[in-house]
């Protein structure tokens, strides 16, 4: 057997074992049988709210079991083909089988990471905010590089994205942006990316070729479901309208279609300029505000709001989560998990899966630095 194929088989088998244990497939199978009996009872609909809860649980379990069973079935099918190709010395088929194992190992690793999702909101869409730190041109450029990195990361995971709001820098890059990430488990994949990111490189904007350090921060919060009620009093809101801006601060609309909403009690601000309609921008900004307030409330309940707010707002040395060094050597290191890689180009192109997996695993084990 080829070494490459052997390694892929070993990795997939390990992933299947971990997924089996993490999801507790046996218990899920038993629970699904119970739910099928409960939902088949016509009297269930006498209590519509309870019926909806049970149906959501049933759908969630069915999805988990289907994903696991499909992965296991595909693995067994390819193993069978590989055994026949080995006997027949069919090298062309073996080449294809090696690629099939490679693709399957990526899927298995993704599912293994998703087993670490523990919050109900992990399955939701999410919003990602990026804000440049102090430093003008350097930090604005770094913020735009981060935006590209996260857009690529979302694309790698099969998520759709929508740029809700973006404020361009005076010369290059962006001062800030808000991206809506659309897809099942989006928040689970992005939530550990919240914090301050530090870049060290030879400045492309400095004629002397000096090495510069730049900071930018990111904050992630889940889009909340419609059935979660967030009460916001009109008297607590300040709503401002303005013209949407383009590069260099140029106005791209002749009407005040962009909307900024401030929740006065918490000083929480959202804004949207992605649509030409002021009404639609206001609705989106309000939806973002509800999501932000929900996130803040959840943080308070878990006694982590102080830490999260520090990560969000303090673009300084003391609150970093990750360092990206491009010169004099190349390394990206997560300061929480110590996971690092020299593939700086890959990371900036959105290859962040290993960083996310390491953070989720650390949180699951409780071994926080």
Curated annotation (Swiss-Prot):
SMART domains: PCRF (SM00937). The lineage of its organism: Bacteria, Pseudomonadati, Pseudomonadota, Alphaproteobacteria, Rickettsiales. The gene is prfB. InterPro entries: PCRF, Pep_chain_release_fac_I, Pep_chain_release_fac_I_sf, PrfB. GO terms for molecular function: translation release factor activity, codon specific. Keywords: Cytoplasm, Methylation, Protein biosynthesis. The modification N5-methylglutamine is found at residue 250. The keyword DNA-binding does not apply. This is Peptide chain release factor 2. Its main location: cytoplasm. Belongs to the prokaryotic/mitochondrial release factor family. It is found in: Cytoplasm. It comes from Rickettsia typhi (strain ATCC VR-144 / Wilmington). GO terms for cellular component: cytoplasm. Methylated by PrmC. Methylation increases the termination efficiency of RF2. Peptide chain release factor 2 directs the termination of translation in response to the peptide chain termination codons UGA and UAA.
């Amino acid at each position: 057997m080829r070494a490459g194929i052997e390694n892929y088989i070993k990795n997939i088998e390990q992933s299947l074992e971990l997924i089996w244990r993490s999801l507790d497939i046996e218990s899920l199978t038993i629970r699904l049988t119970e739910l099928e009996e409960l939902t088949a009872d016509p009297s269930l609909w006498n209590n519509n709210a309870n019926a909806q809860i049970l149906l959501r649980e049933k759908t969630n379990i069915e999805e988990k079991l289907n994903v696991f069973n499909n992965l296991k079935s595909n693995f067994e099918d390819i193993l069978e083909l590989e055994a026949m190709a080995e006997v027949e010395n069919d090298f062309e088929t073996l080449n294809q089988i090696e690629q099939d194992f490679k693709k399957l190992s990526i899927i298995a690793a993704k599912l293994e990471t998703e087993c670490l999702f523990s919050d109900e909101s992990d399955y939701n869409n999410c919003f990602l905010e990026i804000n440049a730190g102090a430093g003008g041109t350097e930090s604005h450029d770094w913020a735009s590089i981060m935006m590209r990195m996260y857009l690529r990361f979302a694309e790698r995971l099969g998520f759709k994205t929508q740029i809700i709001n973006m404020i361009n820098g005076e010369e290059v890059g962006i001062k800030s942006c808000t991206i809506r990430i659309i897809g099942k488990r989006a928040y689970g994949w992005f939530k550990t990316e919240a914090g301050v990111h530090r870049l060290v490189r030879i400045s492309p904007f400095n004629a002397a070729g000096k090495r510069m350090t730049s900071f930018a921060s990111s904050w992630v919060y889940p889009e909340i479901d419609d059935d979660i009620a967030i009460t916001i009093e009109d008297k607590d809101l300040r709503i401002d309208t303005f013209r949407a801006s383009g590069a260099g601060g140029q106005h791209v609309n002749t009407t005040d279609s962009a909307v900024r909403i401030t929740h006065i009690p918490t000083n929480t601000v959202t804004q949207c300029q992605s649509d030409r309609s002021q009404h639609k921008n206001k609705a989106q900004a309000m939806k973002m505000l509800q999501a932000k307030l929900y996130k803040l409330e959840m943080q308070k309940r878990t006694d982590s709001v102080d830490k999260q707010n520090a990560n969000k707002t303090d673009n300084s040395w003391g609150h970093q989560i990750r360092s990206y060094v491009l010169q004099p050597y190349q390394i990206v290191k997560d300061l929480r998990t110590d996971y690092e890689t020299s593939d700086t180009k890959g990371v900036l192109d959105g290859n962040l899966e290993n960083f996310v997996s390491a953070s989720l695993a650390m949180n699951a084990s409780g071994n926080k630095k």
